[in-house]
Amino acid sequence: MSFFIASSPHAHSRKSTPDLMKWVALCALPGLLAQTYFFGWGTLVQLILAITIALSLEALVMLFRKRPPMRALRDHSALVTAWLLAVAIPPMAPWWIITIGLLFAIVIAKHLYGGLGQNPFNPAMIAYVVLLISFPVQMTSWSAPLPLIEAGHEVAKDPVTFGDLLSLIFTGLTIDGSSLQQVRAGIDGITTATPLDAFKTGLHSGATSSEILSQPIFEGFAGVGWQWVNLAYLAGGLILLKQRVIQWHIPVGFLGALLVMSSFFSLFFPGETASPLFHLLSGATMLGAFFIATDPVSASTTIKGRILFGAIIGTLVFIIRSWGGFPDGVAFAVLLANMCVPLIDYYTKPRTYGH
């Protein structure tokens, strides 16, 4: 009698790749809703556009590689890549921004290396960095949070309607012919600066941290809107941990290193750096810690390595935010840490039993 012997590993996860990707998208919903509430419907428009483009590119590349496209589409990895890139760009960014970004993410950063499971770098972050370096104006032109405008700190002379929003994204002009620059000029106050950007600009102009934080955009812990967006992604990340979709090592390493670095410099250089709470709840901190850095393909594979990997990202995020040329450093930090993964895994691989 012959028996079928399966190859190792013999222990399998109950969750398949499509299941994991669905959980990631589901747990990112709170953050998406928070962004939509604070920054308008443009976030949802960018997401729908991104998913459509990403799935189309995924299918075309698979056909070009003479492989069945439906198998790749069913793993939902392209959907997650589109999701992460869509929430990282300004809601009013023109349609070609997300298109160029997804071309880099799907075609170059993913399939050029062999497809799912073969890419050494996070595809969404590759796309984001390419866009940020190539089109800095479009990628840093965030609108003011809607509650800040409604509170009267910034007065919109001609509010942007949903029709104007769609027209701006796809044609570059509103229905009545106004450009995005003219729309922003119609709002008095800080319209294109995130709290991180405003804080760094203030420091460069010679203001102290306390003077900068007195501006209306910094109301709350880490800036109007952004603190709640980060808390929403934190809630989604905790669900991912509870469902064992991700492990705790990378988020703890990331947030722990960022907390230690910001606490140290806030204690000894209080007028030159933001508070730890500001760093934890501003920018893409929670999105990066739970949804980006935890990419199982491009992250470290050992337990000690994952903690070190997260700590490297957290440290680099603080360094780039404090002394770099860009307001936030999550994307650059993740890619630099991706480069270190082979070295991290080599020196943190577990000792073989008996040796």
UniProtKB/Swiss-Prot annotation:
<keyword id="KW-1133">Transmembrane helix</keyword>
<feature type="transmembrane region" description="Helical">
    <location>
        <begin position="307"/>
        <end position="327"/>
    </location>
</feature>
<feature type="transmembrane region" description="Helical">
    <location>
        <begin position="221"/>
        <end position="241"/>
    </location>
</feature>
<keyword id="KW-1278">Translocase</keyword>
<keyword id="KW-0472">Membrane</keyword>
<keyword id="KW-0285">Flavoprotein</keyword>
<feature type="transmembrane region" description="Helical">
    <location>
        <begin position="250"/>
        <end position="270"/>
    </location>
</feature>
<dbReference type="GO" id="GO:0005886">
    <property type="term" value="C:plasma membrane"/>
</dbReference>
<keyword id="KW-0288">FMN</keyword>
<protein>
    <recommendedName>
        <fullName>Ion-translocating oxidoreductase complex subunit D</fullName>
        <ecNumber>7.-.-.-</ecNumber>
    </recommendedName>
</protein>
<dbReference type="InterPro" id="IPR011303">
    <property type="entry name" value="RnfD_bac"/>
</dbReference>
<dbReference type="GO" id="GO:0055085">
    <property type="term" value="P:transmembrane transport"/>
</dbReference>
<feature type="transmembrane region" description="Helical">
    <location>
        <begin position="44"/>
        <end position="64"/>
    </location>
</feature>
<feature type="transmembrane region" description="Helical">
    <location>
        <begin position="328"/>
        <end position="348"/>
    </location>
</feature>
<comment type="subunit">
    <text>The complex is composed of six subunits: RnfA, RnfB, RnfC, RnfD, RnfE and RnfG.</text>
</comment>
<feature type="modified residue" description="FMN phosphoryl threonine">
    <location>
        <position position="194"/>
    </location>
</feature>
<comment type="similarity">
    <text>Belongs to the NqrB/RnfD family.</text>
</comment>
<keyword id="KW-0997">Cell inner membrane</keyword>
<feature type="transmembrane region" description="Helical">
    <location>
        <begin position="273"/>
        <end position="293"/>
    </location>
</feature>
<keyword id="KW-0813">Transport</keyword>
<dbReference type="Pfam" id="PF03116">
    <property type="entry name" value="NQR2_RnfD_RnfE"/>
</dbReference>
<keyword id="KW-0597">Phosphoprotein</keyword>
<feature type="transmembrane region" description="Helical">
    <location>
        <begin position="23"/>
        <end position="43"/>
    </location>
</feature>
<keyword id="KW-0812">Transmembrane</keyword>
<keyword id="KW-0249">Electron transport</keyword>
<keyword id="KW-1003">Cell membrane</keyword>
<dbReference type="GO" id="GO:0022900">
    <property type="term" value="P:electron transport chain"/>
</dbReference>
<dbReference type="InterPro" id="IPR004338">
    <property type="entry name" value="NqrB/RnfD"/>
</dbReference>
<comment type="function">
    <text>Part of a membrane-bound complex that couples electron transfer with translocation of ions across the membrane.</text>
</comment>
<feature type="transmembrane region" description="Helical">
    <location>
        <begin position="78"/>
        <end position="109"/>
    </location>
</feature>
<feature type="transmembrane region" description="Helical">
    <location>
        <begin position="129"/>
        <end position="149"/>
    </location>
</feature>
